[in-house]
Amino acid sequence: NNAKLKYDDNWKEIGFELSPYLKFNTDINSNSIKKFISNLLPEGKGLEFVSEFFHISKANQFSLIEAIGNETAGAITFTSNKELSTNFREISNEELTQRIINRDKVNITVWDKKTRLSLAGVQDKLPLVVLGNDKYGIGEGKIASTHILKFEKNENIHLVLNEYFCMKLGKLCGLNTAEVEIKKFDTQNVLFVKRFDRKLLINEDGAFKVLKKHIIDGCQILD
């Protein structure tokens, strides 16, 4: 089936083109739209899990992106016209530790019977709100995550350390890499990656909001 994208006239005045191949005032190629969406979805086992969780075919990219599209990479939200409630669910250090230890038994991306897997790639990862001083939580609606947590694998126990080393080395070489930190939960090393497409603002009274910044990856740039 052919996919179509039409920008709202008001968006054309105040917004931006989503990618170099999704331009204003042109007939947008259907394949470019599908590729853009595809590169926002998880891959491998992550895609299989999301497909099974929502009972949606892996080939039905548009239904999948609607299901998990409240917080994809960048600033764009994919959703129906339903108004999403905004909530912040705090997670204690103890609860997070137990979920990390038992992630082989209970999928780390499922919290409160909802999947939080909304990022591209094949690695296990968890989007999380980090407010400092070991205060963690999961946001819904207008509250977006500030960090991405990545985990070790049984077959590759040095995965976290290797990615941390590469990110730090890249920064020393002058590359604008994301801020990373390794935190230990019981015996598990976890990589905290500060999202460069998010900005956390905290008021003096403790109220906070997370701003989103639009980004695209190399695949979306090259179509």
Label every PLM stretch briefly.
Residues 1-223:
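Phosphate/dinucleotide-binding and metal-coordinating scaffold of catalytic cores
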